[in-house]
Regions:
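Short, structured segments at the rim of ligand-binding sites
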Residues: 1-139
């Protein structure tokens, strides 16, 4: 059973090396962004050779949302911002993880995911399952 410690506080900053688990990087980064947590994520050198250059793609799309983000050849640094830009279209770069990672931001601001069908590569029912937990999905 997992539960939150009663004294839990959202961290101000996290530093994490994902060299052994690079495929969770996009989810970790977007979670930090949505929660306003500064993060330094390292071990990301293989993200440049996935479906797309995931480091550059994350930087591009996060900046549309107003993020203060910098990348190197193997890391991403994200600083918290005051307000997330609304009604932004997120490009997926034909990468299923881009679509799935950015989708939960809809809990904070309306967003559009371009090329949403890309999720079928790994999670055919992704949009159906989001609807089941009360996400509004149109288009």
């Amino acid at each position: 059973i997992l539960s939150k410690n009663k004294d839990y506080k959202v961290p101000i900053k996290i530093n994490i090396d994902l060299v052994e688990n690079p495929d969770i990087a996009q989810t970790v980064i977007i979670t930090c962004f949505g929660l306003g947590i500064s993060c330094e994520i390292t071990g990301l050198q293989t993200l440049k050779i996935k479906e797309t250059d995931r480091l550059q793609a994350m930087k591009n799309e996060l900046r549309k949302l107003g993020a203060d983000v910098e990348i190197t050849k193997n890391s991403l640094h994200l600083s918290p911002i005051e307000k997330i830009n609304k009604n932004i279209s997120i490009n997926t770069y034909n990468d299923h993880r881009m679509a799935m990672a950015f989708s939960p931001l809809a809990m904070l601001v309306p967003i559009t995911i371009n090329n949403p069908e890309v999720v079928t590569k790994s999670y055919k029912n992704f949009w159906k399952d989001l609807k089941a937990i009360n996400f509004n999905i149109s288009g």
